[in-house]
Amino acid sequence: MGAATSALNRRQLDKFEHIRLRPTGKKKYQIKHLIWAGKEMERFGLHERLLESEEGCKKIIEVLYPLEPTGSEGLKSLFNLVCVLFCVHKDKEVKDTEEAVAIVRQCCHLVEKERNAERNTTETSSGQKKNDKGVTVPPGGSQNFPAQQQGNAWIHVPLSPRTLNAWVKAVEEKKFGAEIVPMFQALSEGCTPYDINQMLNVLGDHQGALQIVKEIINEEAAQWDIAHPPPAGPLPAGQLRDPRGSDIAGTTSTVQEQLEWIYTANPRVDVGAIYRRWIILGLQKCVKMYNPVSVLDIRQGPKEAFKDYVDRFYKAIRAEQASGEVKQWMTESLLIQNANPDCKVILKGLGMHPTLEEMLTACQGVGGPSYKAKVMAEMMQNMQSQNMMQQGGQRGRPRPPVKCYNCGKFGHMQRQCPEPRKMRCLKCGKPGHLAKDCRGQVNFFRVWTVDGGKTEKFSRRYSWSGTECASSTERHHPIRPSKEAPAAICRERETTEGAKEESTGNESGLDRGIFFELPLWRRPIKTVYIEGVPIKALLDTGADDTIIKENDLQLSGPWRPKIIGGIGGGLNVKEYNDREVKIEDKILRGTILLGATPINIIGRNLLAPAVPRLVMGQLSEKIPVTPVKLKEGARGPCVRQWPLSKEKIEALQEICSQLEQEGKISRVGGENAYNTPIFCIKKKDKSQWRMLVDFRELNKATQDFFEVQLGIPHPAGLRKMRQITVLDVGDAYYSIPLDPNFRKYTAFTIPTVNNQGPGIRYQFNCLPQGWKGSPTIFQNTAASILEEIKRNLPALTIVQYMDDLWVGSQENEHTHDKLVEQLRTKLQAWGLETPEKKMQKEPPYEWMGYKLWPHKWELSRIQLEEKDEWTVNDIQKLVGKLNWAAQLYPGLKTRICKLITGGKKNLLELVAWTPEAEAEYAENAEILKTEQEGTYYKPGIPIRAAVQKLEGGQWSYQFKQEGQVLKVGKYTKQKNTHTNELRTLAGLVQKICKEALVIWGILPVLELPIEREVWEQWWADYWQVSWIPEWDFVSTPPLLKLWYTLTKEPIPKEDVYYVGACNRNSKEGKAGYISQYGKQRVETLENTTNQQAKLTAIKMALEDSGPNVNIVTDSQYAMGILTAQPTQSDSPLVEQIIALMIQKQQIYLQWVPAHKGIGGNEEIDKLVSKGIRRVLFLEKIEEAQEKHERYHNNWKNLADTYGLPQIVAKEIVAMCPKCQIKGEPVHGQVDASPGTWQMDCTHLEKKVVIVAVHVASGFIEAEVIPRETGKETAKFLLKILSRWPITQLHTDNGPNFTSQEVAAICWWGKIEHTTGIPYNPQSQGSIESMNKQLKEIIGKIRDDCQYTEAAVLMACILHNFKRKGGIGGQTSAERLINIITTQLEIQHLQTKIQKILNFRVYYREGRDPVWKGPAQLIWKGEGAVVLKDGSDLKVVPRRKAKIIKDYEPKQRVGNEGDVEGTRGSDN
């Protein structure tokens, strides 16, 4: 064990572990605290073995004791721990940390007294401090001295590596925090400039901070040179020169010169101390840069402990660049002033200037449960004492009767009042208004002249542009924006054209307006001129007088002393009367006070004569601004304004004038080069106009946004609430400010009639209607505001979509209304108003197209139109209504578009209805006449989804809970020519589950109209590589069995029909069959295709065969259709084949390659065709790959069509991630490359079973593991890696799969590991399905084995080796081995082909004796070779070709040694 852990013996360790960390706490010291302390020793250049003895602990305390009052939390914790160890070594009995610290403080004071006594004794005896070795300590008295005197010479002692290491570690850990300055002071005590530069040089990674320090050094050095000019003339011999600024910085002086200036010069110049002061100034600037929080911003939180607040306060005050007096003033005033109300009451009771220890002791536990209990006990005690005083002879003042503030009756208080809460003013008690609008309140929310002139009522509206808002009592003009803007600042300003606006208030006879504008999101500081001297001062309306720092201003003339009251007490100032002050363009005369103020202040004595206005309102800066920019390389819109009628121009002028007053838009001039056209339309009531802006060009140039809300909330997903309220955020977009840097792009122009003058140009200050970024920015901003409100109002459930709010709660009506009012107040504080006229308090609530009640919900009334003539547009609207109604009305059909005749038409063209469409329309109208209602979601109760099949390939489903309908939906089959209803059913299941996850976040229990045996029979052979949940099987007639049965093996003793067909380019063809027993039939077809002829041949074989039949075909097209077992098809020929196959008992359908000399197939080919087609495969590989990427045909089709070897065709399919999968899935395909595996853990009989599946083949590896940990998972993965090649592993994101052990195995085995979301159909589809199949197999064989482990392994054997099906009709093991061997054959074939391509051929053609070439060898056969000369492929007899290797450099033709024909008879 290390030194820190062995600092105490067993007895001392027992005593140490019984000491509590805090007096009232339960936690005690542990050995981990010793280990931590040992690691912290190195920061202070101390060895950790000092913790092992009493003397060592005392040395540590001597180092830490001076730093403890201003140290960090870690330093204080270390000091406390060392104090406890000191007491343990000293055998002092202590119970907690405070007792140990008290004992150590006493000891430290004793040590300090002894040291002072020894120092005094030594000085009186010898006059100089000496150590035992005769080395004199420098005059500074510090123990960290870098110089020692030996005899009459001073010798420099460099800084120790431990000191430099401590300095570097402090900077690295604190990052120029406030602790760096005292740390530097402590480590550089008594250092020379050389040593200080050495400390700076070791900070190599902080060049930015060092540059700041360097600039401060240069400035101070220049000031030193100015204040200390060099003496004129040469220096006398032997005299030491005076140090210059660069000498103090150590750049032009030696170490010996620095020592002489410090210790022997006359007068002595302590260059080290001067240089330290310069460095400290630079470090303070760095601290301010790295800690931008001002001490003025440090305020105690409502639940923050006073001790934490004090720590933050002192950390910030150490970072302030101010003198000690100012910091002392800040500490005395701000520490109490910025405390929370609870602590402030206690601190004010301590009297003037309490010590920090008294404040910490008094505020200990404030805000906690014990403190609250104590306050409640004191209050109850006071109440009881008052009651006893009244009972004892009616002594004391009698209590007045209790009166309710809400209803005015006596006998109860407001919180006990049963009547509804009334809006009443807290100031005057009158109903009808709140305190913020009270006229009896002095100058509240009014435009206030400082000199006390008459004021006007203030209109609480937003104004970002600086214009004055209209009065709240003004007459509403009929032409104006439809909604009010929320509250904000309103103030006057000068327009961009330079014209001064009229003021609406009385200004004491001075027609000046407001002389300047300053936003209040920062301190209003302005440069003023006092007697011609520029002074930066704070404009403070709360200060009576103007007071300036003495260092900033020197005034001459008579003055008189004065004492003024401040936050920290009285201040002695000098009063100068009748002094000239210039603020902006106003020249005033008044009284100036000069004194020790922390900041210059302009008070009301000078502000009042200037007649300014103070406008108080809600600041729009509270709402965060979302930055927006244009796309890369795009520019803003520059579209000319089109002509408008006079009526529209006047309407736009009225609207924009109102918008400008409310601050939503502001005027711009011609310097803005962008423009967007505007126009206006009449509203629905035809009495008002609405302004519209054509932002199409700006939307094209604006950056892309992502809709943060991907859909509208559905009422079926809402929980049932006792109370509901629906709110609407009024003028939603106009409540959110637009990025100031983007506003210029929204500029628009209102033209004038007949171009009688220039148009008036504006730009938006808030989110405009019609701009692409407005919805996203509003959604994101409103969501962040509501997130904080939801935390403060947990009793409310708030659902937001854009500006519509659904608010529900389980409270009673009175409490609910109170909570909603709190919500509206909080939204109002952010500038989001909820107008009363759009607030819905009584059901039914209109919300998002629904009608809501507390116990149910309905769709708004849907009425189908009755028209004589219908256009395409009318039909589209009708289908949209039916789709919307289908979420609650079951049985609706939307096949009207397909049933209407006429083909594709324009939107306004008339369409003709078919009888089927009219019948469907009438049926839908009847369904909509009945009232349907949905219920709300009840958590904890399972949801069931019932599926019903409709006519025309449509499906309907209902979500129910306890028999009540939550929601209804419908599903239509995908657009496929040949479909299987079971496959459609699987797609429907996935749609239902996805919809349930979106709305409720859980999966429903499915009720499907199919028998279990029927489904499992189909699913066993045609399972999807996707996830299918559990469901209940409901037997209904439609899907009992609607498809035919295909057997896996030939039917014995039954005739075999070989079908074939041929088609010519003239659209004429033949189709027929020949049977094993000699039957044959051939028919001539007209106007057909080869595919149709193949299907016709199969139909003929089915017509002429018995109940059991074997059919062999060479058509991949026909084979692909029929093996999918479709139940319906758009092709009449396929429908006839399906009907014939359903009548059969057993059908064996097999494919063989065409034109390969296979018996039966060759005979039928001769009957229907002449000649065969041969294609060389090597030139067709790229074409085959392109065709496969487009149509995804299988490898057999590729090999047959393009004449490719099987291994080449299989490789093309294997390279496609969409095709190398099991079955024929429609959705949810996963990557099934040859090396891809999926792994998951499942549970069986309370044991963990880990399963891995090879995706491409379905091969399973599984075993029982003791625990679901990363170690066991890694061991299982290593077993599989030792047996099979793995290149990619896909799992879910469980902790065992994301562990370090699994990551290490994947790294070692070069396995790409990906994770996905559990139950996602596109993630773990294969493994989820295999888990289900494995459990089904185990259930069938569980009785045959004793142990679960044996059952799992036996199930793997049965699945891998005993079941055939899927791709190629093989077992999983055969398929996996086939995939691996195919990979090896491909590699071998590629090597062989590459070798062949390395040969060159010289050849002769016909009777031409000239040898041609060289050509590229493509293929070498027994009697001929295939070569490529240029772009031509040629077949040349073997005897007319000479093959040579392509050596470099090329060989000559006459070199017979390289000619293949000269090497022997084998060639």
Swiss-Prot record:
This is an African green monkey isolate. This is Gag-Pol polyprotein. Mg(2+) 2 binds at D1114, D1165. Its EC number is 3.4.23.16, 2.7.7.49, 2.7.7.7, 3.1.26.13. Specific enzymatic cleavages by the viral protease yield mature proteins. The protease is released by autocatalytic cleavage. The polyprotein is cleaved during and after budding, this process is termed maturation. Proteolytic cleavage of p66 RT removes the RNase H domain to yield the p51 RT subunit. Capsid protein p24 is phosphorylated. InterPro entries: Aspartic_peptidase_AS, DNA/RNA_pol_sf, Gag_p24_C, Integrase-like_N, Integrase_C_dom_sf_retrovir, Integrase_C_retrovir, Integrase_cat-core, Integrase_Zn-bd_dom_N. The gene is gag-pol. Keywords: Aspartyl protease, Capsid protein, DNA integration, DNA recombination, DNA-binding, DNA-directed DNA polymerase, Endonuclease, Eukaryotic host gene expression shutoff by virus, Eukaryotic host translation shutoff by virus, Host cell membrane, Host cytoplasm, Host gene expression shutoff by virus, Host membrane, Host nucleus, Host-virus interaction, Hydrolase, Lipoprotein, Magnesium, Membrane, Metal-binding, Multifunctional enzyme, Myristate, Nuclease, Nucleotidyltransferase, Phosphoprotein, Protease, Repeat, RNA-binding, RNA-directed DNA polymerase, Transferase, Viral genome integration, Viral nucleoprotein, Viral penetration into host nucleus, Viral release from host cell, Virion, Virion maturation, Virus entry into host cell, Zinc, Zinc-finger. It comes from the Viruses. It comes from Simian immunodeficiency virus agm.vervet (isolate AGM TYO-1). Gag-Pol polyprotein and Gag polyprotein may regulate their own translation, by the binding genomic RNA in the 5'-UTR. At low concentration, Gag-Pol and Gag would promote translation, whereas at high concentration, the polyproteins encapsidate genomic RNA and then shut off translation. Residues 845-853 are annotated as: RT 'primer grip'. SUPFAM superfamilies: Acid proteases, DNA-binding domain of retroviral integrase, DNA/RNA polymerases, N-terminal Zn binding domain of HIV integrase, Retroviral matrix proteins, Retrovirus capsid dimerization domain-like, Retrovirus capsid protein, N-terminal core domain, Retrovirus zinc finger-like domains. Its cofactor is Mg(2+). Residues 1050-1173 form the RNase H type-1 domain. Residues 116-144, 1447-1467 are annotated as: Disordered.
